[in-house]
């Protein structure tokens, strides 16, 4: 299977980017992931290479054939686990890569086999290349030099943080890094009796994470580990199946298909038998169709299938801005620090994230991840820099842009419906003052019906467009992609990510897409020494975590976002609560005034009091209806927005991020790779927990008619 380049690569020059933003922004993004599988190979340093070609060559050939078959089926015969939508990119062939530590005869021979097969190779060395070469046997140095000069070597990561005196720790880090950067691990030894405890533990962890694990099970046989269906411990409850046998090959095919999110068996082509509808069933179906025609789809937007969700995602368009300004209008009206001016146009920050907004003097707003981009271009190699830009950064920008768009659509819809419901009630009550003017009353009724029609149309549009569901999905995707750039700099982005299951069955495509994207991310090249770790830790501290704005200095990162969101959400919640109480208070005042006038009229039967109470009665009726209605509008917007919960969550996140920032700043003094990996794992978990809480807050906040 030949590896081909995708066509064409999105523009990277600033001038080209700016021109594309104005004409065809979608062309800047490679959205569909490339079908990719990374095969990691680990072995003892002293393992003999004799059996490697006999075992590895047929396995790699079989994997190539499987991927070619999967990719051809996805292209020409849609019928995936996600429905009939094609999941993977069609402008590039499937990509099979070999990841190995080049640590001895066996892994060097594995690299030679992959090189002759034309497969891309990504190598992770336990030391810098010079030290690594010195620890090899004289005969192995020639193979090592040949591997480094190979045109198929696409990534070379040198773990230069541990001295050769601590060879055990260095070997363990290299092996764990290979496994973390792989989707399928082949151990060139007996996994039941591993050559050392570290490899055994690493393989156990790989089994438990759901990774495919293969091992030698004889002189010229290799087997696949298959956990039992009801396994309590996937690392212990299972069996080995030889991939030479038909049963083992079938299990490997099914396991690889599951990992890629593809169907394990071809889709059924049988024609379903036509259903017989009774007259009663036809009547019910007609009533449901009439209901949907007026009010839109029944139930919540989560009824959309994974197929339609993924297909819609691929068909989306990146947007520079929009006119759905309901939430921004709400902020302008009900926050203490108002926006500079009200504007109907909402900026989605597509150009700011992609290329920045520099001023004439060179200052201004920088592009998103600009510090990380500079680090990648200087220290991580051209292949990684290109993959980082097009696979991680631009897909995050795309997902973030869509999330902003649909959040504005959704928020504008529910704010608009609540506000219009108040307008409809106001029109009905104000018609009291029209007296006997029948024509004007008829006009008022028509206007009220038009307002109600606008409410129903907004409700129907939200249901049909699934604005709420798309916002939830795209925000979850963006929040999964953004923090992944940090472990990617360490070559530690795992394709085995498992997102928290959602109550929305249509959201499973998000986890599939994130895993497919992570498998595409190439290995960075260069030395990963203490200086490199300090740079990466500094990026995590300053760019991802950031700091709050103070002393006239603009804030940055997640701390600045959560600080601002806490303040804004608190003011929104508080002011909506205050105005709702004010309307109820005014209702009480209006009612008390009417009762007082009535009592004065009762005890002093004069024409003056009679005239006053007769004139005030319609106004009291109108105020008694309109004021509570707008109080309910304020409370409804406050309840659906749930600004209080959002403010409290942001406050908690600021405290957690500040603790992580202190931990990172302490690690910068004397960084170690394994501790840095643990810190990034903790940071990713903290951000994932925040996303989970946010999803719980807004998952059931669907748009209503406002009544």
Regions found by a protein language model. Name each.
Residues 5-266:
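Acidic/glycine-enriched connector segments
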Residues 265-585, 595-707:
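Conserved non-transmembrane functional hotspots
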């Amino acid at each position: 299977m030949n590896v081909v380049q995708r066509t064409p690569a999105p523009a990277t020059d600033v001038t080209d980017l700016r021109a594309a933003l104005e004409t065809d922004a979608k062309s800047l993004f490679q959205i569909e992931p490339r079908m990719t599988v990374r095969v990691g190979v680990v072995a003892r340093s002293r393992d003999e290479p004799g059996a490697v070609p006999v075992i590895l060559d047929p396995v790699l050939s079989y994997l190539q054939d499987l991927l070619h078959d999967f990719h051809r089926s996805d292209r020409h015969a849609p019928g995936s686990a996600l429905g009939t939508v094609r999941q993977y990119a069609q402008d590039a062939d499937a990509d099979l890569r070999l990841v190995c530590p080049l640590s001895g005869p066996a892994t060097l021979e594995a690299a030679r086999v992959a090189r002759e097969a034309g497969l891309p190779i990504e190598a992770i060395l336990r030391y810098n290349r010079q030290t690594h070469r010195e620890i090899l046997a004289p005969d192995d140095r020639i193979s090592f030099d040949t591997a480094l000069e190979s045109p198929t070597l696409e990534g070379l990561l040198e773990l230069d943080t541990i001295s050769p005196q601590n060879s055990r720790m260095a070997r363990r880090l290299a092996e764990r890094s290979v496994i973390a950067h792989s989707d399928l691990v082949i151990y060139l030894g007996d996994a039941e009796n591993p050559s050392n405890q570290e490899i055994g533990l690493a393989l156990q962890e790989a089994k438990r994470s759901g990774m495919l694990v293969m091992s030698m099970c004889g002189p010229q046989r290799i087997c696949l580990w298959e956990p039992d269906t009801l396994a309590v411990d996937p690392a212990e409850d299972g069996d080995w199946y030889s991939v030479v046998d038909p049963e083992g090959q079938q299990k490997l095919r099914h396991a690889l298909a599951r990992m890629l999110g593809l169907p394990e068996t071809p889709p059924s082509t049988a024609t379903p038998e036509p259903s017989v509808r009774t007259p009663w069933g036809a009547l019910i179906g007609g009533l449901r169709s009439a209901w949907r025609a007026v009010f839109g789809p029944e139930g919540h937007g989560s009824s959309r299938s994974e197929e339609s969700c993924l297909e819609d995602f691929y068909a989306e368009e990146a947007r520079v801005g929009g006119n759905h300004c309901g939430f921004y209008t709400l902020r302008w009206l009900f926050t203490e620090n108002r926006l500079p001016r009200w504007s109907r146009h909402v900026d989605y920050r597509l150009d700011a994230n992609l290329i920045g907004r520099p001023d004439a003097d060179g200052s201004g707003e920088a592009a998103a991840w600009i510090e990380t981009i500079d680090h990648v271009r200087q220290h991580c190699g051209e292949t990684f820099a290109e993959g980082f830009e097009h696979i991680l950064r631009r897909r995050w920008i795309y997902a973030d842009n869509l999330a902003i768009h649909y959040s504005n659509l959704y928020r504008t819809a529910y704010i608009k419906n609540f506000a219009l419901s108040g307008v409809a009630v106001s029109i009905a009550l104000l018609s009291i003052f029209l007296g006997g003017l029948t024509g004007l009353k008829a006009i008022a009724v028509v206007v009220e019906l038009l307002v109600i029609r606008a409410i129903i149309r907004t409700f129907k549009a939200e249901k049909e467009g699934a604005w709420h569901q798309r916002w939830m999905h795209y925000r979850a995707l963006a929040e999964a992609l953004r923090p992944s750039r940090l472990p990617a700099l360490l070559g530690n982005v795992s394709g085995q990510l498992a997102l928290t299951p959602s109550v929305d069955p249509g959201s499973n495509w998000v986890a599939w897409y994130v895993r497919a994207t992570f498998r595409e991310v190439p290995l960075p090249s260069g030395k990963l020494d203490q200086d490199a770790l300090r740079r990466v830790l500094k990026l995590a501290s300053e760019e991802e975590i950031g700091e709050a704005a103070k002393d006239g200095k603009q804030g940055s990162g997640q701390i600045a976002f959560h600080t601002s969101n806490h303040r804004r959400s608190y003011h929104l919640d508080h002011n909506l609560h205050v105005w709702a109480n004010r309307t109820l208070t005014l209702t009480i005042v209006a009612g008390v005034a009417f009762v007082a006038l009535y009592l004065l009229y009762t005890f002093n039967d004069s024409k003056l009091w009679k005239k006053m109470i007769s004139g005030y009665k319609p106004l009291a009726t109108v105020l008694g209806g309109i004021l509570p209605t707008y109080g309910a509008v304020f409370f409804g917007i406050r309840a659906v927005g749930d600004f209080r919960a959002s403010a409290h969550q942001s406050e908690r996140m600021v405290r957690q991020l500040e603790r992580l920032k202190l931990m990172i700043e302490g690690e910068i003094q004397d960084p170690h790779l394994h501790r840095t990996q643990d810190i990034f794992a903790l940071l990713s978990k903290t951000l994932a927990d925040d996303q989970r809480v946010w999803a719980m807050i807004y998952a059931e906040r669907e748009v209503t008619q406002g009544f």
